[in-house]
């Protein structure tokens, strides 16, 4: 018999994380109840495998011993660089959740080292749990707080790692790229599959991120799987990277730029693939204000330019448009654009994502430029959005109009890479 | 001396398309004035080359003989299939513009055949100039008119080709995919480089499109360069294709599906790469209403859900959200989503573009589903938008909620292709 649901909450969800004994298919099974994505009742058995059941009989909910880590104290190794790991939540931090039934990770250095012991051969780890939130809930306020914590950590560590949910990791990486001028590596890392799954990318990504954090890098980067195998990670510039797949482990790709480098696994040997800010090249500096009233609008055939008026009337002075092709919107947007451009910064990007905006080729584009719109060059729409939040938070409208065209953190390449 | 500009209109633009004689670099040049993308004064010389000048002296504006094509009359070849070419404008149709100085192409069958004579070996061409507009100016009204013209043409032709600007070609292809059930091929084709440039893709794309229009296909497709070389075109399903580069000739890619086929050039041999609707498989049927009050909203960290209320209060009942990752928005959107879902259809897609939406994995996703949002599976956001315009134009809200989850024109693949 399959237990019925109470309203929206199924039996399986009420038992999530608990140890149970059930009868199914004529046998007895014991294990931890896992979140069910399919409507099945899923158990993690002691051998590590997950098994799903359509029909089962619940025999017993077992008491679990309170989680006592008993982890050995970490001893600092001489000669290894100090690296700070700041956790913000997401799949990569959900490691411990269903192993013990505990839903929230403690995220101590000892815990991380016991999960991924190879880390201690690369660096001396400090750990800090800043947030435990899903990355779709990250807000500009969180970026500011995170930037301040990273700024502080950079003063007495050789590098900083930020574990982050993958949904908005590239937004956060772009935000920190603008807010922080850093002489040391700041490495975002996440996982597409949680650590309780055999295909998890959490440990390998973290090891490669630790390697990156000790390397000759002086900028904010994202380090994630470079292929669907466990053979290498890629290090992407924080302002040129995008999540381009909902579930693949190699979902993160550099767009309109080569990745900065490649870190082979398990050798952790590094190959540089592009130019980069080097360690010590820039001074440590925090410029951490962000203007919230900036909006990204994706154009489509038939979309009325009223949406520009709507945001403008609410006090928005920063607009990023995701236009078509080389950077176009319908001709009937031009009048509204001209009015909005009088006291606002409007940046044109392309929903093609790859390639460079060029509004000098066709009539519509030239009209858009005459209206006062600024070409976003080869910037990703998401990056242009955050750049504008940062510019309008720290500079005047006129300064922002000049600076948005120029590369601040490597977000504009001089020529487009194919 | 470089002629000064009058307001926004430069001398070069006033002369565009006219034949002139100038003095520059100590020599005399004669040719047709081309649109200038760089601020230079550009002449197309009689040998076909374009030359740009920074400084020049205008000597004479020459009268041009009225354009007399003197084209041989096309004779229908027995045994070749009849194909209708409908022109809507865009780069591919700009072929004739600056060859003669005429700004608008006549777009007769004779003209096309004289430009691309190999066409007459593939099919007997009929031609119709429906629009001459840049594709960023296409509107849902144009899709309806276009669908009606194609519907009519399909009755007495073996296939239909639509020449179209590339900016929104994939939107138009998706629109016709839903509006037209077709037993014959309907082939969209465009060019990324206009025919007066040596690197133009116009002729090859048109020849491959003609081949596709005579093949065993019974659906709406897009036929464009498959690589940056002139070696093959790909035939993409109209509801699985997207322009993914601002300028590359192979900008169009199938997303979350394999292309239907590959047409080698110049052999025009066809290789099928995926399933397809076959010729004669479906009845000819036109379902051509579209609801305009449907909107696509791209989510980003910090975006307020007020935007949903704004459109809802204006009578919008169709919403496509471009969420993050597997299909997420911030948790503080849930209450608004629940209210909007009461009388509207809200579809979740992913700004990752590649991969499938799955809101059953994480808490936020499950909350989104409970609010009444429907998973857009592996549909592109743009395709989900147009599908919803079509569903709400022709069916009730309740019917639309059911149909949006099911594949109508091949827009949802049973499993995601990697």
Curated annotation (Swiss-Prot), chains A, B:
**Annotated catalysed reactions:** L-glutamyl-tRNA(Gln) + L-glutamine + ATP + H2O = L-glutaminyl-tRNA(Gln) + L-glutamate + ADP + phosphate + H(+)
Q: Which SUPFAM superfamilies match?
A: GatD N-terminal domain-like, Glutaminase/Asparaginase
Catalytic site positions: 91, 166, 167, 243
Q: Name one Pfam family in it.
A: Asparaginase_C
On whether Protein biosynthesis is a keyword of this UniProt record, the answer is yes
* Single GO MF descriptor: asparaginase activity
Domain named Asparaginase/glutaminase: residues: 81-407
What Gene3D superfamilies would the database entry show?
2.30.30.520, 3.40.50.40, L-asparaginase, N-terminal domain (3.40.50.1170)
Query: EC annotation?
Result: 6.3.5.-
> Which spans of this chain does the record mark as coiled coil?
none
Q: Biological process GO annotation list?
A: amino acid metabolic process; regulation of translational fidelity; translation
Q: Which UniProt keywords apply?
A: ATP-binding, Ligase, Nucleotide-binding, Protein biosynthesis
InterPro entries according to UniProt: AsnA_fam (IPR006033), Asp/glu_Ase-like_sf (IPR036152), Asparaginase/glutaminase-like (IPR006034), Asparaginase/glutaminase_AS1 (IPR020827), Asparaginase/glutaminase_AS2 (IPR027475), Asparaginase_C (IPR040919), GatD (IPR011878), GatD_N (IPR040918)
- The record's top EC class is ligase
Q: How does it assemble?
A: Heterodimer of GatD and GatE.
The UniProt similarity line reads: Belongs to the asparaginase 1 family. GatD subfamily.
Q: What does this protein do?
A: Allows the formation of correctly charged Gln-tRNA(Gln) through the transamidation of misacylated Glu-tRNA(Gln) in organisms which lack glutaminyl-tRNA synthetase. The reaction takes place in the presence of glutamine and ATP through an activated gamma-phospho-Glu-tRNA(Gln). The GatDE system is specific for glutamate and does not act on aspartate.
Return the protein name. Glutamyl-tRNA(Gln) amidotransferase subunit D
Look up and give the organism this protein is from: Archaeoglobus fulgidus (strain ATCC 49558 / DSM 4304 / JCM 9628 / NBRC 100126 / VC-16)
